[in-house]
Amino acid sequence: MTVKMISCGLVASIISFSAAGDNVSFPARDMPAHDVVVCGGGPAGCAAAIAARRSGLDVLLIEAQSRLGGTATSGGVSHWLGGRNDEGEWVVGGVFRELSLRAEKECAAILPKLPAGKTYQPYAWLPWFIHGVVLDSDRIALTLDAVMEEAGVEVLLETRAVGVEKSGDIITHVITHSKDGFRRMPAKVVIDATGDADIALFADCPVLFGRDDDHLTTPASLTFHLSHVDGNALWDEIERSREPKFRPLIEELKKKGEWPFPYDIFISVKGLTDDEVMINTMRLTEIDGTSAESRTKGYMRGRREAYQLLDILRKYFPGFANSQMKSIAPMLGVRETRRIDGEFKLTVEDLRRGTEFPDTIGYSMYGWDLPDPKKPSVQPMVDETGGGFVNKAKKHLVTPIPYRVMVPRRCRNLLCPGRAISVERDVLGPLRVMAPCMAMGEACGIAARQIADGAANCDVDVSALLVELRRRGCIVDKAALPLVRPRVDPKASGEVHAHVRVHMD
């Protein structure tokens, strides 16, 4: 919501929130000004903060959880996806590559390789799937703490953005709330890395929610980790059966009435130790990730299902007979909520055509993974009846990310990296995961230099931005050559839809 500042003293202000026609006033502490305030300390926000600070800007990063890293740490999804191709080559460089290599050196991550003579490897759930970076969620949080301190980024944890103040189409302050009350954070540039377009919503930028017809979103998950798993027994069975999701076994259990869930897949990823496995099987339907009531239902249902799953795994699945619950994620894994409705929108048709964009700031190598809101085991853009993005080699396709997808309307100094970008909904599949979110965040952090110097977000000199991204090793040009191109309609023109002003030489 947009907040009205009523009065201002030397150290405190009175702010007024409008709700249901009533005004409610609260004292708010005035904070020192920053060039950039980044809202959200997940992958996009962390990369944005680092990049902006390295661009010489004074940066404040606020995060609602107790640690940085977002879904990778608090969400328990110990897997940075989408940043390497199926041969293990880098598709996303810059901060993502730097953090991955540093985490590997600090024993906080593993960069998987396909074992000789094998079709599957234990760090994934698809054949030849090695492009993820497997993490220790606790240690990677420690790595992120250190990186922020080294870069000189100011961090506030357990702090949530709850509103903004605007002057015309400029955000002047971000209003936050934490244990010590409300604060007014002055900023020249605001980066909305909340994943939910919270700041865009507060700033009255147009946003969309879920599917166009019913506004339902793809299912959420509550990830959990098991210990004391016989990994060899599990991976040997997957290699033998070629069924990493155990669909035939699940069908048998359904017939017996011993699989009580609406999803019929099993997803496991080996952890950093031989006996640890991340379980990302749950598909919690009808969860609104922007509603406290709905999220509460998701947590309660998720914790219940975690222990139901554990009992079934111990009884029927190879390798799990002696497994123990190690942890259940303290944060719900939400895949989709709001998206900004920008002047430019990346569409499925753009990608079918193989459209080349003059403002591509990075790529994703992840698949078209966006489960149906009502049929949680169905992937509309992957199944045969879907969007035609399946190829015979079953290799992943490169998806380009134009700068313009991060530019909202009605606000000149706001950028929105991450899953809340301006795209046709189905395009979220390859772009919502963590490595491409880091690519987007890094581009926003670098673009913030121009915006802090007076440029509007839609008037950023993209030529200069791309030069700097390449200088920092963020854009991996080799990634622009996908292993398999999408099917191209020969009647399509492949033109670039330049709805937002982009400066190009």
Listing of model-derived features with the role each one plays in the protein:
Residues M1-S7:
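Bacterial N-terminal signal peptides that target proteins for export
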Residues L10-A12:
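Hydrophobic helical h-region of N-terminal Sec-dependent signal peptides
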Residues P27-D30, T73, L114, K118, ...:
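Flavin (FAD/FMN)-binding glycine-rich loop and adjacent Rossmann-like elements that form
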Residues D30-G42:
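Beta1/beta-strand and adjacent pyrophosphate-binding region of the FAD-binding site
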Residues V36-V38, V59, L414:
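Conserved hydrophobic helix-helix packing surfaces used for dimerization/oligomerization
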Residues G45:
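N-terminal Rossmann-fold NAD(P) dinucleotide-binding loop
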Residues A51, L57-D58, A64-G163, S167, ...:
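Conserved N-terminal/central alpha/beta ligand/cofactor-binding core
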